[in-house]
Amino acid sequence: CFLKTYRAVIAGGPDEQLPPEGILRDYLFKDSRKGRVFPVKRPRKGVREAVLEYRIVETAPDGSLSLAEITLHTGRTHQIRVQFASRKHPLYGDGKYGSRFKGDIALQSARLRFVHPDTGKPMAFSLPLPAAAPWKEFLE
């Protein structure tokens, strides 16, 4: 079993479109000519289902940003970016998908767990939150 958990800083806080935790399920269409991925209403040729589970860990005091933990159930191109942006919560720094914040895209692989293929030993790796903006907003 291979488990990878991501962290992202997203615009805004929990609301009707994005409760404090949940599962996001969408159909995504990858337009290679435009270099973008779009959510669509129904399956059709070239469309793939995208599923992720998330939890809002903390929201900044002014409500402008939130820290989210994300586990992918599928691994689609730009999946995390598109699924949050389609709910009006783009990732910090992600101008391609609607962020008004300038900077690097605030998406990080936070934890990785798997069973070593030779020894069978459980392996686990994790990264701390970066000390740079916008992550430092959520450091204790």
Question: Where are the model-predicted features located?
Answer:
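RNA pseudouridine synthases
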Residues: 1-140
